[in-house]
Amino acid sequence: MELTWELDLFRAADAEGIVDLYREVYGDNYPVKTVYDPAEIIRQDACGECWRAVARSAEGEVVGHVAFYRSSPPNPRLYEHGQLMVRHAYRQTDAAFALMNYALAEIPGRHGLEQIWGEAVCNHLFSQMMTRDNGYAETGLEIDLMPAESYTQAFDAAAASNNRVSTLLVFRSFKPKPQTIYFPPVYQEQLRFIYAAVDAGHRFEPALAPLPAGMSTLAELATFTGAAVSRITVQAIGADFEARLAQLESEASTACAVVKQ
């Protein structure tokens, strides 16, 4: 019998089905544990932390899912696009492609998203092909980002690995804006190469000014225990930058982070 589905935006009644879908695809190994809490999924939608789209079978079962959500970047208007998955029985259909196209057509415009980003895993080509086909640009390679156990249930033996999984960092802008970008001269060639795919008339200037003496560094550490990843986000650099960075790197080591970003 041919499998069919309906694409729709998230409803509260989908929350239990989304949790069940995560368990079918990832078991209990997904590193962000809030995905296993139906009440948290509903709360995130209500307050705009996460917007989701789903594919439902004719019987109303959630058979596919994708999300736009706030993650580690400090900009509350920059949403990560990810968590695309379908039930095993639907993997030989185009449900995932249809769901991603539907979500991109509906959610960013509905909620005024100006830019989104994602992490396309490197243990298969599927997500890389989808992001490329949908106008994303690759801006970085995150080496050994995800633990192997996150994928032992999600993929077959060919895509599963005993090693950590790297990802491509990708961005898509819906409202490109020219910016003045300051960069260390030593990285000029590399950064111009990276920005070439997302250039919106940016102006590039060498970062030659000294650290501001009367200002403290504003930076924070986010640790994702399940993935053994620590991310240091710097919003403003002050005279104490070197000491503050060393402190946060030490805290990341104490948290047993395998990957530090």
Where are these regions (language model features)?
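Conserved acetyl-CoA-binding loop-helix of GNAT-fold acetyltransferases
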Residues: 86, 92-107, 116-118
